[in-house]
């Protein structure tokens, strides 16, 4: 029974640690978990991303997360209109442990991007989602189901909870400031991109438990984030420092680091016929009460596609069970560039 409880605790730990919210380490490829205001905040009019993560591989039946997201901006090409809009859609699913406890969530976001000047925008966004949480009861084993000789699944488990799947509605909102510049007139001048913002998830504090009699609500999650892309003394090298601070109930997390981007081929700033080819790499760190993980990352971008690979190296006390094996993460993104050229100062602006 003790071993069973330990396995259940290990399965639930990554979920309970931050209130069932998913965690991707490639935050530049999973913006929907940071701020719904990121919908439409990119150089292009359409992008689609898929993410996959396998966490704590040394533990039996590790914690796996899958997601896909899509966002589309419209009304951007009208130079006389200071405001345009964007829609975002995300779907994610996570599965953990032998009992396959999992959460499936589908969300839709709507953002308004207000032009402050040629290069700066203020963004406000709302997000609504619908989720379902369940587990595979057939895989659960209880001490009362051992006959003294072997395990007998026909014996009652003696538990009052039915563990039936439950659903919930969720709301989030966010604001952000986005600066993006593409200087066509000076060839070697580095374009820059910066985002700062604040978001709040679980505004309605949805009921979140298998037992309907329990008053268990998901606490709001507050996120403050900032990132910027700076040029260097080398015209084809860029520096990208970034930081996210998350607070949810009594839990908090700081995720920060920096990436370096090497431009192997610059995208055309006027015609758009030549696509960007770049290699990006760096290291981030996740800190709670202690240093939790170190995350090396690498991205390869070519012809509107970007492939990302990272690995969470666990350095917290859990490393005794995980053998420093945190989680492998993969992402693939496609961005469709803007069809209009001269009216958009962010077209082919260098971004991460």
Predicted regions and their residues:
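Extracellular loop and loop/strand-boundary signature of outer-membrane beta-barrel proteins
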Residues: 55-56, 93-97, 156-162, 209-214, ...
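N-terminal, post-signal peptide beta-strand-biased segments of exported outer-membrane/organellar beta-barrel
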Residues: 18-85, 97, 334
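Outer-membrane beta-barrel translocator domains and adjoining extracellular loop/strand segments
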Residues: 61, 101-104, 136-143, 186-188, ...
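Residues that define the transmembrane beta-barrel architecture of outer-membrane proteins
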Residues: 30-32, 44, 62-68, 83, ...
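Outer membrane beta-barrel transmembrane domains
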Residues: 195-203, 214-352
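Cleavable N-terminal export/targeting peptides
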Residues: 1-22, 337-352
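Short loop/turn motifs that connect adjacent beta-strands in outer-membrane beta-barrel proteins
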Residues: 38-44, 75-84, 98-100, 116-122, ...
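Outer-membrane pore/translocation modules
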Residues: 28, 110, 116-231, 241, ...
């Amino acid at each position: 029974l003790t071993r069973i409880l330990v396995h259940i605790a290990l399965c639930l730990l990554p979920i309970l640690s931050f209130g069932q919210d998913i965690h991707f380490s490639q935050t530049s490829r999973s913006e929907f978990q940071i701020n719904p205001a990121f919908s439409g905040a990119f150089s292009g009019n359409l992008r689609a991303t898929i993410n996959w993560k396998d966490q704590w591989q040394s533990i039996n039946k590790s914690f796996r997360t899958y997601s896909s997201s899509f966002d589309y901006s419209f009304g951007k090409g009208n130079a006389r209109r200071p405001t345009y809009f964007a829609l975002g859609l995300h779907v994610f699913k996570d599965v953990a442990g032998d009992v396959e406890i999992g959460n499936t969530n589908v969300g839709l976001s709507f953002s308004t991007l207000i032009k402050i000047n040629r290069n700066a925008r203020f963004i406000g966004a709302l997000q609504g989602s619908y989720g379902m949480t369940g587990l595979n009861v057939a895989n659960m084993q209880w001490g009362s189901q051992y006959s003294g000789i072997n395990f007998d699944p026909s014996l009652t488990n003696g538990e009052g909870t039915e563990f039936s799947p439950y659903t919930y509605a969720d709301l989030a909102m966010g604001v952000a400031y986005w600066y993006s510049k593409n200087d066509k007139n000076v060839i070697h001048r580095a374009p820059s991109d910066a985002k700062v913002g604040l978001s709040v998830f679980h505004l309605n504090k949805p009921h979140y438990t298998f037992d309907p009699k329990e008053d268990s609500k998901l606490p709001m999650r507050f996120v403050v984030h900032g990132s910027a892309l700076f040029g260097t003394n080398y015209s084809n090298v860029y520096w990208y420092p970034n930081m996210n601070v998350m607070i949810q109930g009594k839990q908090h997390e700081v995720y920060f680091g920096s990436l370096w981007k090497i431009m192997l081929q610059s995208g055309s700033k006027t015609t758009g016929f030549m696509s960007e080819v770049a290699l990006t790499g760096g290291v981030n760190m996740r800190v709670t009460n202690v240093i939790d993980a170190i995350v090396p990352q690498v991205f390869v971008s070519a012809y509107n596609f970007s492939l990302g690979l990272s690995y969470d190296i666990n350095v917290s006390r859990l490393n005794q069970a995980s053998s420093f094996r945190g989680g492998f993460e993969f992402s693939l993104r496609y961005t469709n560039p803007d069809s209009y050229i001269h009216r958009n100062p962010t077209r082919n602006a260098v971004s991460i």
